[in-house]
UniProtKB/Swiss-Prot annotation:
Name of this protein: DNA polymerase processivity factor
Basic residues composition bias: residue spans: 389-405
Family note: Belongs to the herpesviridae DNA polymerase accessory subunit family.
Source domain of life: Viruses
Functional description taken from the UniProt entry: Increases the processivity of the viral polymerase, probably by acting as a sliding clamp that prevents dissociation of the polymerase from the active template.
A Pfam family annotated for this UniProt entry: Herpes_DNAp_acc
Gene3D superfamilies, A to Z: 3.70.10.10
Biological process annotations from GO: DNA replication
Annotated region described as Disordered, given as residue ranges: 327-414
Plastid listed as a keyword: no
InterPro entries referenced in this protein's UniProt entry, alphabetically: DNA_pol_proc_fac_herpes (IPR007013)
Entry keyword set: DNA replication
Length: 414
């Protein structure tokens, strides 16, 4: 079957540049496992990159600079390339990136094949030669039928740039993890203010402010290296983005590699927020680029909340909440019907020891103690609590005459 195929593209990889990017690959290999290997761009300057998802709202792009030593096109000549295949094929444990970024690799090549009579490649074959000049590996898989437009995401120009320090990055990662553990909304709002030079991150009612040091320059061509101390920025306009909390947390972890790079926020003119791994000045220049594109997330709407400034809505909601509270309290404690002092229901039967039944009046609410709504004052001040002895005398004086006037005794023996 392999003999019947026609070679369309054949490329020899620059092994040294792939080895130089091995540290970045090992840092993000868990994300790249389910990603796509892409060869895009012009045929004169092809780009090798691996694209994967960063949680639910981010796109991770790992690019290798100067990836090929030679690039030949036999059939299907096109002005632009768009070749994609899975890093881990279906039903297999083989990983292309593991072989291509290996430290013991001496030579590697990729060959794209097509069926006779067709004008597009259908399969890709990788050939890897190890340092011992004996061990070789070869693997063939089919191409994907579609190619995501990953090269079109960075279409806009960089309008603002924010470079974080090690201390600030650690603080933000810890704060986002705390908000995630609290079960807060999964949406984070990033607000960038030009006048105050601050970056505000808010999750629900919690917020965190990062004070930045503004510098002069063009955001697209300045701040090309990260600094371990201090948070610097170039802001041309105010920005506000709603992104996924998990994706932002993953982007900060992906773009922070010890002794190599720190996260940098790039705000593009087309509304795209990009987190880039910006390399240190003192570190050896790597032959790769690492970035995470954060997609816009719709903030969770609280339908029970009340927008600020809408007084009528606030009043209606307050009345509704009061009525709901009253209905709940009434369902738990049903209202009692008022009892008249002269009605037979106000007498209680108290069984006596000698077999007689005593009838006494309920004195819990007397006529003198009841007040009509007109008699109640507008605001009653709490009176001082009387002493225990005076309270007993007053209660004893009230109960004395009433108990004498209502002595009703019935002896069934007589």
């Amino acid at each position: 079957m392999a003999e019947e195929m026609e070679e369309t593209h054949c490329m020899a990889l620059n092994v040294e540049n792939f080895k130089a990017c091995a540290k970045i690959h090992n840092h993000v290999k868990n994300y790249l496992k389910k990603g796509l290997v892409q060869i895009v761009g012009f045929e004169t300057e092809p780009v090798f990159q691996i694209m994967a998802t960063a949680c639910d709202g981010g796109i991770l792009v790992f690019k290798v600079l100067n990836p090929f030593e030679s690039f030949n096109v036999s059939y299907s000549r096109m002005e632009t390339l768009s070749l994609s295949f899975k890093n881990q094929p279906h039903g297999n444990t083989y990983l292309y990136s593991k072989d291509l970024f290996g430290e013991a690799v001496k030579g590697a090549s990729l060959t794209f094949l097509q069926r006779p009579g067709l004008c597009r490649p259908d399969f890709v074959r990788s050939d890897v030669l190890m340092d011992d000049d004996v061990t070789t590996s070869s693997h063939c898989t089919s191409l994907t039928s579609w190619s995501p437009p990953a090269h079109d995401i960075r279409a806009g120009t960089v309008m603002s740039k924010v470079v974080l320090s090690i201390k600030t990055c650690t603080m933000l990662q810890k704060w986002l993890k705390d908000q995630k553990s609290k079960g807060e909304p999964r949406c984070v709002r990033l607000c960038l203010n030009e006048i105050l030079s601050v970056l505000v991150l808010s999750v629900g009612e919690a917020s965190k402010t990062v004070h930045l040091k503004p510098v002069e320059g063009n955001p697209a061509t300045s701040l090309l290296f990260a600094d371990k101390q201090g948070d610097v920025c170039i802001i041309s306009d105010d920005e506000a983005h709603d992104v996924s909390l998990d994706s932002l947390l993953a982007a900060l972890g992906v773009c922070r590699i010890p002794a190599l790079c720190l996260p940098c926020f790039n705000f593009h003119s087309n509304g795209v927020l990009e987190v880039v791994g910006l390399q240190f000045k003192s570190s050896k220049p790597a032959s790769g680029e690492l970035s995470v594109f954060l997609l816009r997330a719709n903030p969770q709407v609280d339908f029970n909340g009340v927008p600020e400034g809408d007084v009528q809505t606030q009043e209606v909601s307050s009345v509704a909440s009061t009525c709901r509270h009253l209905s709940e309290s009434c369902s738990l404690d049903p209202p009692r019907t008022p009892e008249l002092p002269g009605s037979p229901d106000t007498f209680k039967e108290i069984p006596g020891r000698s077999g007689s039944v005593h009838l006494e009046r309920d004195l819990s609410c007397s006529d003198s103690e009841e007040e009509t709504p007109k008699q109640k004052p507008a605001k009653a001040k709490p009176a001082a609590a009387p002493k225990r002895s005076e309270k007993r005398k007053r209660e004893g004086g009230k109960k004395g005459p009433k108990a004498k006037s209502l002595k009703l005794t019935f002896n069934p023996l007589i």
